[in-house]
Amino acid sequence: MLPFKKADSPFKSNPVSRVGSSTRLNQLGNIKSNPTTPNAALYVTSSLNPSKNLPTNAANVKSRLQTQKDLDAFKQLPMVQKVNEYERLLNELSEAVSQFKNDELQEKIGQIITCNDVLKQQIEDLNKHRNYSYEVDKLSDRNKILEENSKFILKELVSYRNELKKLPKLPKSDKMVNRNVDVDDILKYAFKLAKFTKAPATVANMPFQIHPNNYVWPAEDSLRRGMLAQASLQAEEIIRHELGETDKENSNEVKTESKVDHDDDDDDEMEDVRISNENTNDEQRSKPPAASEHDTSKRKEEQNQQPVDLNLDLFDPDDEYSD
């Protein structure tokens, strides 16, 4: 590491010591020491040799370069390349000064200043990255602690589960759940739900869907309207059927037929009666019909009676098949 001059030079080659002047003065008191040679303990290694300059302690032992591949990757870093460029520019500047090349001095100094500014900015960024690395180390340590805690909790849960399995259990009931359901029960339940459900909006608005009015069979609304219209046209017959008056009318007709059979001998008298009945019918048609006392009393009784349940409630929620 001691620079020497060329052998063909007329001057003698003398080694240049890198030891400071104060150290050399202190070494003069020691007769055995040679002031022309530097002390091995005070020798300073080059800052551009990362494999030797990196300190090896417990904190950064993992960051020490171990292989040539790591060294090549280290040399490819932008900051290391800038440092090498800075060193090259300094060597060129020193060579230009030694050779008295004044035309290159200004250009070299400008390049050194720009390279120095870039290195300064990269050093500031390097400090930020170093702080980030410290935070990453802290987070990794915390992650390890949390992982250990989670493993411990899982182990405890597994042990508790095994203890619960060892505990005595209640006897199982012999009653089995009937999984086989009759189709009729499903249909009844579906009929009950159909009154309160409808097709979803996504299905109802699908294209090429057949509307219920275009079905071959009549829709539910048309069936309801038809039944209500038929009931409104035959209201009296339905009321009589519910009240049981049809049997009384049939019995009255049977009695009249028996009376007619007994009076076959009096044909002449019946003809006169028929003629008189026809005359009275003509008079009654010309006059407005007068309500008899029997009819009025009957109507009052019907009004006083409670309304009859005709079982025409098509929307009875208790009915199984009502739509």
UniProtKB/Swiss-Prot annotation:
<feature type="compositionally biased region" description="Polar residues">
    <location>
        <begin position="11"/>
        <end position="36"/>
    </location>
</feature>
<feature type="region of interest" description="Disordered">
    <location>
        <begin position="1"/>
        <end position="36"/>
    </location>
</feature>
<dbReference type="Pfam" id="PF10018">
    <property type="entry name" value="Med4"/>
</dbReference>
<protein>
    <recommendedName>
        <fullName>Mediator of RNA polymerase II transcription subunit 4</fullName>
    </recommendedName>
</protein>
<feature type="coiled-coil region">
    <location>
        <begin position="79"/>
        <end position="167"/>
    </location>
</feature>
<dbReference type="GO" id="GO:0006357">
    <property type="term" value="P:regulation of transcription by RNA polymerase II"/>
</dbReference>
<dbReference type="InterPro" id="IPR019258">
    <property type="entry name" value="Mediator_Med4"/>
</dbReference>
<dbReference type="GO" id="GO:0003712">
    <property type="term" value="F:transcription coregulator activity"/>
</dbReference>
<dbReference type="GO" id="GO:0070847">
    <property type="term" value="C:core mediator complex"/>
</dbReference>
<feature type="compositionally biased region" description="Basic and acidic residues">
    <location>
        <begin position="241"/>
        <end position="262"/>
    </location>
</feature>
<keyword id="KW-0805">Transcription regulation</keyword>
<keyword id="KW-0175">Coiled coil</keyword>
<comment type="similarity">
    <text>Belongs to the Mediator complex subunit 4 family.</text>
</comment>
<dbReference type="GO" id="GO:0016592">
    <property type="term" value="C:mediator complex"/>
</dbReference>
<keyword id="KW-0539">Nucleus</keyword>
<keyword id="KW-0010">Activator</keyword>
<comment type="function">
    <text>Component of the Mediator complex, a coactivator involved in the regulated transcription of nearly all RNA polymerase II-dependent genes. Mediator functions as a bridge to convey information from gene-specific regulatory proteins to the basal RNA polymerase II transcription machinery. Mediator is recruited to promoters by direct interactions with regulatory proteins and serves as a scaffold for the assembly of a functional preinitiation complex with RNA polymerase II and the general transcription factors.</text>
</comment>
<feature type="region of interest" description="Disordered">
    <location>
        <begin position="241"/>
        <end position="323"/>
    </location>
</feature>
<feature type="compositionally biased region" description="Basic and acidic residues">
    <location>
        <begin position="282"/>
        <end position="303"/>
    </location>
</feature>
<comment type="subunit">
    <text>Component of the Mediator complex.</text>
</comment>
<keyword id="KW-0804">Transcription</keyword>
